Amino acid sequence: RNLTLYGFAPEHDLQLQGKKIHFGTAGAAVHIVDSETREYRESTVADLYDIARLCDQMEHIHFFQRPIVCRDLDDPREMDFNTCYASISGTRKHVGTSFVQPEHVEDALKMLHLVSGGEAAWRARPFVSMSNCFVVPPLKFAEDASRCLEAAVRGGMPVLLLSAGQAGATAPAALARALVQATAEVLAGLVYVNAIEKGALAIFGAWPFISDLRTGAMSGGSGEQAVLMAGCAQMAQFYDLPSGIAAGMTDSKLPDAQSGYEKGYTVTLAAHSGAHLIYESAGMHASLLGCCPESYVIDNDMLGAINRTVRGIEVTDETLGLEPIRDVCITGPGHYLGHEETLSRMQTDYLYPEVGDRESVNNWLDQGSTDITERARERTRTILASHYPSHISPEIDEQIRREFPVRLSRERMGLLVGAGLEPAPTEEGLPFPPNF
């Protein structure tokens, strides 16, 4: 019941117990907002790598689940492999991904063994988990997904057990009944996992979605979505199970006012409901069909502030002590601006936004009167021009490229910078042979 999701680096390990909360990404968007043209286009494997290294620099995004589909890869096996490769190459945080066939899971496990230093090292610290829609609501197991689930469990990969019915379509329209169905489906998944391997690492992932009943379209930014996901988290708390829910799935297409208010109330309610993992909490738009790089930077500020509300007010004998009041009001200057407690708590009790604006009007005008999207876009450019993670050694990366069809060039990944390496002759890779 107390589960650890490991990062590639130990400082990114996530403890799923009690009321600890971790924010992360997720999604399967087929479009991305181009940062330069501001237009929607199909997402690529290079985009996925860029988003991973962008999130690697976001303090309040604690784990990285792949948010987009690599639309430039037609072969499903290559797409699954390169999705995993691009994600683990771009961040040292825990990574989540998914697979459509069990053979694809085996491909990824072989790569992960190489990166980890062997199968035993991987099993000791599995830093990649699989999101698995093992059920086709209402109340039916999905054959291919279940076979993927079996491959992951046997391979030592943690699994997020997803039930993603849509209220009014594949789940009841009554929210309480939709919650009942989703809970039953995920509990069935837990039984299935333990039948494969007792005590395997599994996360309660009841994700019933909301339909706009006027059109049948998903409405991820609705108030109904917020309360339904909060209810799922509370059911996991009731069963004392590690949980992951989804919030932040705005219906807006761009990082605008609608995006802000929908993400604000859905993620805040999720955080205060007791979920251990909150997926989709940054970057997503258009009810999960779109993604915007600048939104990760904007949402990082939001997540930090929300986490601060969860932390609450520290009430102890020390924080209630009257000595600072006595110092200021009786023997001091009558204000707390220079008091030692003010200075010491400046960094421990208070959080400061990275791109949010707190300047005076005059300072804001002097600095170009930019809005948050412009500042986030500039921050995104800076990170993507300079942050090229190197936690996977060039030797291991070269071996991966020899054995698998990697569809990201070293040049595009910045792996040649300062390394003195030439492009490998297998840079474009060979497709998986028919019986690989």
Question: Model segments located where?
Answer:
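Glycine-rich, N-terminal phosphate-binding loop and its surrounding beta-alpha-beta segment
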Residues: R1-V33
